[in-house]
Amino acid sequence: MSTYEGRWKTVKVEIEDGIAFVILNRPEKRNAMSPTLNREMIDVLETLEQDPAAGVLVLTGAGEAWTAGMDLKEYFREVDAGPEILQEKIRREASQWQWKLLRMYAKPTIAMVNGWCFGGGFSPLVACDLAICADEATFGLSEINWGIPPGNLVSKAMADTVGHRQSLYYIMTGKTFGGQKAAEMGLVNESVPLAQLREVTIELARNLLEKNPVVLRAAKHGFKRCRELTWEQNEDYLYAKLDQSRLLDTEGGREQGMKQFLDDKSIKPGLQAYKR
């Protein structure tokens, strides 16, 4: 179980069998993201990245919400009343964990969307490698309803995962949609009944824990970078990642996998990971 009890005010961390559950913990505010939460999440992510007990990170929310987005009072009204340099600091901290750290995180990440997911919550949702949501979850880009366009990297997140028409429809109308629609749109990998959400997420996390962590990191980073590069750049970059993973992999995953398949005949790599 967790060794982090009481360390952070707005975030809880529980580690179970290699899975680090990172729980946004402001249920009375539907886990709205405040400047304090943003600062604490930077520390949480950097701490867990170095913790060998945390093999896969699952991001979820306490109570009935994943996150309602940015805390309107703390993030906007109070920050807007301060100097411009304060606004810049607060925005930088928000982007640091919601996108920069999470998107290229060293370990696999899964968004476990248990309820409300609004506005700024779309950035960390898409930054996670994989996402499972509850059928009962409610998603919405409500910024237009209170007079601003989507902030942070919400529009970029939508553009990278959801088609042009669907993105603009929800950005411009502010209408909400449920878990099944989120899965249909490709915003999440799968939508399941809330009662099954944790079980399904744990099953996925255990699948990832079976994989070689060095190679898994190279594979996910390679995919995310390749979307930004030309074909020629990708050829060089992805071969470099392949060579890098072999150098960094102390357990010799490639050699182990080849041996178990070709020599020992003990695995079927099309159906399972090699035995670590």
From Swiss-Prot:
One family name in Pfam for this protein: ECH_1
Enzyme class per UniProt: lyase
EC number: 4.1.2.61
Organism: Pseudomonas fluorescens
Documented effect of changing residue 123 to A: Reduced kcat compared to wild-type but not markerdly
GO biological process, one term: isoprenoid catabolic process
Subunit structure: Homohexamer; dimer of trimers.
Protein's job: Catalyzes the hydration of the acyl-CoA thioester of ferulic acid and the subsequent retro-aldol cleavage of the hydrated intermediate to yield vanillin (4-hydroxy-3-methoxy-benzaldehyde). The enzyme is also active with caffeoyl-CoA and 4-coumaroyl-CoA producing 3,4-dihydroxybenzaldehyde and 4-hydroxybenzaldehyde, respectively.
Ranges that cross the membrane: none
Protein name as annotated: Hydroxycinnamoyl-CoA hydratase-lyase
Catalytic activity: (E)-feruloyl-CoA + H2O = vanillin + acetyl-CoA; (E)-caffeoyl-CoA + H2O = 3,4-dihydroxybenzaldehyde + acetyl-CoA; (E)-4-coumaroyl-CoA + H2O = 4-hydroxybenzaldehyde + acetyl-CoA; (E)-feruloyl-CoA + H2O = 3-hydroxy-3-(4-hydroxy-3-methoxyphenyl)propanoyl-CoA
Keywords from the named record: Lyase
GO MF annotation list: feruloyl-CoA hydratase/lyase activity
